[in-house]
Amino acid sequence: MTISLKDVEHVAMLARLKLSDEEKEMYTKQLNDILKYAEQLQELDTENVKPTAHVLPIKNVFREDKVHQHLDPEKALANAPEREENFFKVPKII
């Protein structure tokens, strides 16, 4: 698989990026270099390699939940431009 100049131009258009001709050429070359490296990785023999999610043996470390003093609702809402009961009122965005 290779990346063409047209592919780079299409992605730049989707991302709303204005790229110079030199940048388009540079990104095309860099992306193709990355793909060539990924193809080299595909050639590795992984037949006897055990599948892992992480190279180090890691387990989740959880902490105990502790109750802490919290901010009083009146203080939290003191500088709110608008509020409704004990909630911040914000403009509808959808």
Swiss-Prot record:
Catalytic activity from the UniProt record: L-glutamyl-tRNA(Gln) + L-glutamine + ATP + H2O = L-glutaminyl-tRNA(Gln) + L-glutamate + ADP + phosphate + H(+); L-aspartyl-tRNA(Asn) + L-glutamine + ATP + H2O = L-asparaginyl-tRNA(Asn) + L-glutamate + ADP + phosphate + 2 H(+)
Top-level taxon of origin: Bacteria
Keyword tags: ATP-binding, Ligase, Nucleotide-binding, Protein biosynthesis
EC code(s) of this entry: 6.3.5.-
SUPFAM superfamilies: Glu-tRNAGln amidotransferase C subunit
Matches recorded under InterPro entries: Asp/Glu-ADT_sf_sub_c (IPR036113), GatC (IPR003837)
Entry GO MF terms: asparaginyl-tRNA synthase (glutamine-hydrolyzing) activity; ATP binding; glutaminyl-tRNA synthase (glutamine-hydrolyzing) activity
GO biological process: glutaminyl-tRNAGln biosynthesis via transamidation; regulation of translational fidelity; translation
PANTHER family named among the record's database cross-references: GLUTAMYL-TRNA(GLN) AMIDOTRANSFERASE SUBUNIT C, MITOCHONDRIAL
Subunit structure: Heterotrimer of A, B and C subunits.
Similarity section: Belongs to the GatC family.
Protein task: Allows the formation of correctly charged Asn-tRNA(Asn) or Gln-tRNA(Gln) through the transamidation of misacylated Asp-tRNA(Asn) or Glu-tRNA(Gln) in organisms which lack either or both of asparaginyl-tRNA or glutaminyl-tRNA synthetases. The reaction takes place in the presence of glutamine and ATP through an activated phospho-Asp-tRNA(Asn) or phospho-Glu-tRNA(Gln).
Protein name as catalogued: Aspartyl/glutamyl-tRNA(Asn/Gln) amidotransferase subunit C
Species for this entry: Carboxydothermus hydrogenoformans (strain ATCC BAA-161 / DSM 6008 / Z-2901)
